[in-house]
Curated annotation (Swiss-Prot):
Protein source organism: Homo sapiens
Function: Acts as an activator of serum response factor (SRF)-dependent transcription possibly by inducing nuclear translocation of MKL1 or MKL2 and through a mechanism requiring Rho-actin signaling.
Region annotation (Actin-binding 1) ranges: 199-299
One BP term from GO: positive regulation of Rho protein signal transduction
Comment text on domains: The actin-binding domain 1 (ABD1) is intrinsically disordered, and binds to F-actin with higher affinity than ABD2.
Region of interest (Interaction with actin), ranges: 240-285, 352-381
Protein name according to UniProt: Actin-binding Rho-activating protein
Keyword Phosphoprotein: yes
Region: Actin-binding 2, residue numbers: 300-381
SMART domains: Costars (SM01283)
GO terms, molecular function: actin binding
Pfam family, one: Costars
Biased composition (Polar residues): 69-79
Length: 381
C-alpha cells in the first residue's frame, strides 16, 4: 500500500477517536454538574429559614464548650443526617460534618420598604388636605410619625419646604391656643352668680378662634391645588385639538374673505371698502408691504443687504482717496468704477441709493461709464 493511502486511512480513525473522547468528556462533565446541582438543592432545602451563609461565624481562637443539643435542635438536625454524597466519600466525612451542621445559628432578616416618589407626594397631599379639612385637636402619636417620616424622606426640596412651613405654622398655632385656653373660662362662683359667666365664656372662645385663625395660615384651598386647577382649565381651553382646529380654520376663512374684498383681481373686490381703507401719502405704512407678511420679511432682508453694500462702498472710497485739508474725501467716478466693479457690478445703483440716504454727493441724475468718468464723488459720512 502506498504511504499516501495509509495516511488517508488513519485520518478518519483518529477523528473518530477524537470525537469519542470529546463525547465522553462532555458526558462526565454533565454528570458531575448534575450531581453538584442535586447536592446543592438538597442542602438548600434542609437549611433553616432565616439563616445567612457566613453571617455568624465562631472565632477559631476562642472555642466555646459544646452544649448538649436540645430537643428542638435535634429535630432540626435529624433531616440533615442523610444528605447525598458523591461516590468515593466514606462515612468518616459524614460524621465530621454532622457537628458542624448542628452549630448553625438562626438570624432574623428584616426588610425595609422605602416609598417611591409618587407615594411620598401622595402622603404630603393627604396630610395637607387633612390639615385644611380638620380643625380639631391632632392626635399626639400618629400625625407626628407621619410628619417626621415625610420631612426626613429624600423627596423634593420644594415639597419638604412647603410641608415644613405648614407644620411649623400649625404647631405654633396650637401652642398659642393651648397657652391661651385657661384664660378663656373663669371658674369663679361670683362670676357665675353675677350672670356674666355664660357670655364671658362664649365671647373669649370666639375671640380665641379669631386669634387662632389669624395666626394659623391655612390655605383654603391650597395654592398648589388652585395652580393645578388653573393649569388644567387652561390646558382644556387652549390645547383642545378640535377647538383649536376649528378656531384656526374660522380665523383663516375670515382673513381670506377680507383679503379678497381688498384684492382688485378678485371677483369679490369691494371698491368702496378698498377706497375707504387705502393709505394716503404721509400715513404710517404708506409705500410699504403689510406687516407680518412674507413680502415684508423679504423687504427687510433686502434693506439690510443694500445697507451693507453702501457701507462697503463708503469704506472703499475712504481707502482710495486722500483726506483733504477741509476734511472732505473725494474720488472720481472712473477710478471708483474700475476699483468697485471687481466687487459688484451694481456701482451706479449703489451710488444712487447712497446719495438718497445722504452718504455721498455728486452732480447729475445719472452716471455713465466713459462719459462721466471725470465726475467727482464726495463722501459726506
Amino acid at each position: 500500500m502506498a504511504p499516501g493511502e495509509k495516511e488517508s486511512g488513519e485520518g478518519p480513525a483518529k477523528s473518530a477517536l477524537r470525537k469519542i473522547r470529546t463525547a465522553t468528556l462532555v458526558i462526565s462533565l454533565a454528570r458531575g454538574w448534575q450531581q453538584w446541582a442535586n447536592e446543592n438543592s438538597i442542602r438548600q432545602a434542609q437549611e433553616p429559614t432565616g439563616w445567612l451563609p457566613g453571617g455568624t461565624q465562631d472565632s477559631p481562637q476562642a472555642p466555646k464548650p459544646i452544649t448538649p443539643p436540645t430537643s428542638h435542635q435535634k429535630a432540626q438536625s435529624a433531616p440533615k443526617s442523610p444528605p447525598r454524597l458523591p461516590e468515593g466519600h466514606g462515612d468518616g466525612q459524614s460524621s465530621e460534618k454532622a457537628p458542624e451542621v448542628s452549630h448553625i445559628k438562626k438570624k432574623e432578616v428584616s426588610k425595609t420598604v422605602v416609598s417611591k416618589t409618587y407615594e411620598r407626594g401622595g402622603d404630603v397631599s393627604h396630610l395637607s388636605h387633612r390639615y385644611e379639612r380638620d380643625a380639631g385637636v391632632l392626635e399626639p402619636g400618629q400625625p407626628e410619625n407621619d410628619i417626621d417620616r415625610i420631612l426626613h424622606s429624600h423627596g423634593s426640596p420644594t415639597r419638604r419646604r412647603k410641608c415644613a412651613n405648614l407644620v411649623s405654622e400649625l404647631t405654633k398655632g396650637w401652642r398659642v391656643m393651648e397657652q391661651e385656653e385657661p384664660t378663656w373660662r373663669s371658674d369663679s362662683v361670683d362670676t357665675e352668680d353675677s350672670g356674666y359667666g355664660g357670655e364671658a365664656e362664649e365671647r373669649p372662645e370666639q375671640d380665641g378662634v379669631q386669634v387662632a385663625v389669624v395666626r394659623i395660615k391655612r390655605p383654603l384651598p391650597s395654592q398648589v391645588n388652585r395652580f393645578t386647577e388653573k393649569l388644567n382649565c387652561k390646558a382644556q381651553q387652549k390645547y383642545s385639538p378640535v377647538g383649536n382646529l376649528k378656531g384656526r380654520w374660522q380665523q383663516w376663512a375670515d382673513e381670506h374673505i377680507q383679503s379678497q374684498k381688498l384684492n382688485p383681481f378678485s371677483e369679490e373686490f369691494d371698491y368702496e371698502l378698498a377706497m375707504s381703507t387705502r393709505l394716503h401719502k404721509g400715513d404710517e405704512g404708506y409705500g410699504r408691504p403689510k406687516e407680518g407678511t412674507k413680502t415684508a420679511e423679504r423687504a427687510k432682508r433686502a434693506e439690510e443687504h443694500i445697507y451693507r453694500e453702501m457701507m462697503d462702498m463708503c469704506f472703499i472710497i475712504c481707502t482710495m482717496a486722500r483726506h483733504r485739508r477741509d476734511g472732505k474725501i473725494q474720488v472720481t467716478f472712473g477710478d471708483l468704477f474700475d476699483r468697485y466693479v471687481r466687487i459688484s457690478d451694481k456701482v451706479v445703483g449703489i451710488l444712487m441709493r447712497a446719495r438718497k440716504h445722504g452718504l455721498v454727493d455728486f452732480e447729475g441724475e445719472m452716471l455713465w461709464q466713459g462719459r462721466d468718468d471725470h465726475v467727482v464723488i464726495t463722501l459726506l459720512k
